[in-house]
A protein has these predicted regions:
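A conserved beta-strand-loop-helix scaffold within acyl/acetyltransferase catalytic domains
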Residues: 13-150
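Aromatic (often tryptophan-rich) hydrophobic motifs at membrane interfaces
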Residues: 114-212
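Residue-level detector of family-conserved "landmark" positions at structurally sensitive sites
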Residues: 11, 40, 75, 176-177, ...
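Structural alpha-beta junctions
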Residues: 3, 32-38, 198-203
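Short, basic/hydrophobic alpha-helical segments
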Residues: 1-6, 166-167
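Divalent metal-dependent hydrolysis catalytic cores, especially in the metallo-beta-lactamase
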Residues: 6-14
């Protein structure tokens, strides 16, 4: 690769929870070649073979949503959910979704069995939602958001519980995604605590770097 002007190889292995069989051969090859870990993010994952009970706080939030009559459904209305998601990201983080609503709708149309939207609704109006990417082994929560109303009555907690206990109970893993920024040097402690309240525990997402 030196002949082509390449000076550095950056490799992000697929976390083991997405593999159907053990497949860490590339990691050993990188170690043997002298690669180093340049970044380490931390995700939160539920192992359905060793389910941990929900925390009391999460149970109270779910009970609040149940009392409010919140209902959970699979949905194809990406427009309404994207409005919620965009508002949340802009107001709380000053950012926007990686995908536009048109892009995510297109991806869903091409991979309808692997990309799905679930919403929590109050009087038939979505107030929380999760876009899930499915693999053979794992359900990955790619986008998660709730409106102010949804947050106040525990709609997102109810939706997450619905996905864990009913929709994806047959999957080996349910992955909430990472709670870190800046290559893993910043940990959002409130976010990871919320995920752990549903019984999730840590899985690292590493990045390897090899000088050529």
């Amino acid at each position: 690769m030196q002949e082509t002007g390449i000076e550095k190889l950056i490799y992000k292995p697929v976390p083991y929870i997405y593999n159907r069989i053990p497949s860490d051969e590339p990691l050993y090859a990188l170690f043997h070649a002298g690669a180093t870990i340049s970044a380490r993010a931390i995700s939160t994952t539920i192992d359905n073979d060793e389910r941990i009970k929900f925390s009391q706080l999460r149970k109270r939030c779910i009970a609040k949503a149940t009392k409010a009559g919140i209902e959970c459904h699979e949905s194809n209305d990406y427009n309404k959910f994207w409005d919620i998601l965009t508002e949340v990201l802009q107001s709380r983080h000053g950012s926007t979704p990686v995908h536009t609503k048109e892009e995510i709708a297109l991806l869903h149309s091409r991979f309808p069995n692997n990309i799905k939207l679930y919403t929590a609704e109050s009087n038939s109006t979505p107030i929380a939602g999760i876009v899930v990417y499915e693999t053979d082994t794992t359900a990955h929560f790619q986008y998660i958001a709730a409106s102010d109303e949804g947050c106040s009555i525990g709609a997102l907690d109810m939706l997450i519980a619905h996905l864990i206990e009913k929709v994806y109970a047959h999957k080996r893993y349910i992955d909430f995604g990472i709670s870190t920024e800046q290559g893993g040097t910043y940990l959002n402690e409130g976010l990871i605590k919320q995920k752990e309240g549903f019984g999730g525990r840590a899985v690292v997402y590493d990045t390897y770097e090899l000088s050529i």
